[in-house]
């Protein structure tokens, strides 16, 4: 049984990967700054530590995991784009990788972002083809970490894959994010005010994003991989799907807020590597994912 260490395991994405990893037969160890959560799947071993502290990586030396799945980062909505925390997480991530390599680690998968790409007016992102020119501190920090991590992996002979996350929605989403804002309003019968939602994006349901990362970890694929649905939609399609799932399409107020003029009109992902090399594709339709999302919000 291969031991995997998961960071960011209580986060929006990280929490969903635990059950797929257990189902795949991993010995799952998870890191959190708080005690083990009550919702934890049976079989996960929790370790309370703060990776931003200098001595935190001693845990890696003790556990000697063969695999590493690293999600932990500063992801506070509205703040993470410009947060100094991005720099702290670059430093912490490099300490983590050094400890992982020193402990005999074999394969690491780290979470990247679509914000590493150059966002033009319309951008279809293809690994190794689309220019990497991040416009934010968040994107630049992830981009810099990837370059250093890949060089480190080559030098220390461990495999490394980099999963670039695009746009995500689903249970446990922060109410300050698009999906969380709309779903939380609909769940209590409140008007969901949004922009016209004409921009095109690639949305992936959070539990499926977690499944994709578990599949990436279990594969032999290295380098950057877009982790997305490959099924771009206008933002308003997601918003309206949530409205229909809630049974309250009348509460959806498209155009009640102005669109951000700085956002690209279209930002989509090529998922050829994920589909053909990793062997993973999503199975839920947008409507199915919206129904599951609203069911969670209605019973939380």
Where are these regions (language model features)?
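N-terminal Rossmann NAD(P)H-binding glycine-rich loop of SDR-like oxidoreductase domains
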Residues: 4-24
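NAD(P)H-binding glycine-rich loop region in Rossmannoid oxidoreductase-like domains
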Residues: 51-88
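Conserved Rossmann-fold NAD(P)-dependent oxidoreductase catalytic core, especially the SDR/UDP-sugar
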Residues: 70, 94-137
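Short alpha-helical oligomerization interface
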Residues: 77-92, 126-134
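NAD(P)-dependent short-chain dehydrogenase/reductase
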Residues: 122, 147-202, 206-210, 239-246
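Active-site helix of classical SDR
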Residues: 137, 141-144
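C-terminal substrate-binding subdomain of Rossmann-fold SDR/epimerase-dehydratase oxidoreductases
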Residues: 186-300
């Amino acid at each position: 049984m291969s031991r995997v260490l998961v960071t960011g395991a209580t986060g929006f994405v990280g929490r969903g990967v635990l059950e797929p990893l257990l189902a795949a037969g991993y010995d799952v160890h998870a890191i959190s700054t708080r005690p083990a959560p009550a919702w934890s799947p049976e079989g996960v071993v929790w370790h309370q530590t703060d990776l931003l502290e200098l001595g935190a990586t001693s845990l890696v030396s003790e556990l000697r995991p063969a695999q590493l799945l690293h999600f932990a980062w500063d992801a506070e909505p509205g703040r993470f784009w410009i947060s100094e925390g991005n720099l702290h997480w670059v430093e912490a991530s490099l300490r983590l990788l050094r400890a992982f390599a020193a402990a005999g680690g074999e394969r690491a998968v780290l979470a990247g972002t679509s914000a590493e790409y150059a966002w033009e007016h319309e951008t279809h992102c293809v690994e190794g083809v689309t220019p990497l020119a991040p416009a934010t501190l968040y994107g630049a920090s992830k981009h810099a970490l990837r370059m250093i991590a890949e060089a480190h992996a080559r030098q220390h002979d461990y495999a490394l894959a980099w999963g670039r996350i695009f746009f995500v929605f689903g249970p446990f989403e922060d109410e300050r994010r698009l999906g969380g804002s709309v779903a939380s309003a609909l769940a209590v019968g409140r008007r969901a005010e949004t922009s016209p939602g004409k921009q095109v994006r690639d949305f992936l349901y959070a539990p499926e994003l977690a499944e994709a990362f578990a599949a990436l970890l279990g594969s032999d694929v290295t380098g950057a991989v877009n982790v997305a649905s490959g099924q771009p939609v206008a933002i308003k399609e997601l918003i309206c799907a949530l409205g229909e799932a809630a049974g309250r399409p009348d509460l959806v107020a498209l155009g009640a807020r102005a669109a951000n003029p700085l956002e690209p009109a279209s930002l989509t992902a090529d998922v050829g590597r994920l589909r053909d090399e990793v062997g993973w594709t999503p199975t839920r339709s947008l409507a199915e994912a919206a129904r599951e999302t609203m069911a969670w919000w209605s019973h939380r």
